[in-house]
Amino acid sequence: LEAAFQRKVYTLIEEGETFGASKLNSIMKEVLTDFWGDAIEIDDDAALTWMRQAHYYMGLYSYTYSAGLVISTAGYLHLKHSETGAEDWLNLLKSGGSKTPLESAMIIGADISTDKPLRDTIQFLSDTVDQIIAYSAEL
């Protein structure tokens, strides 16, 4: 729901439109109605739910989710494929925020100054989807 709401808002922004709360209310109600259909009644107050999402107003909030997914996937792959993976993971945890994000990621072999961890994550997700499809075909 949040992604659909944001997609519509950012599309309007990219198209050069300006708008206020009433437009945001309209977009939110439309998204909720599209999602829930006639399963529930969407009243006018439901359109205000976008206001309680403080992270909408925080720059780069979606970046933290993406970075977290990429770094955690890199950590999992390092743990799975490296003889020092478990030790490196413990060292990352022991670092306790004493390093920059780049330095922390490097402990588990994720050089986030390059696109390699992102590409590895995309490949991992692609492989996972392929596995799910293969397992589903066996059912």
Briefly describe each language-model feature range.
Residues 3-139:
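C-terminal, non-catalytic "cap/extension" segments appended to globular domains
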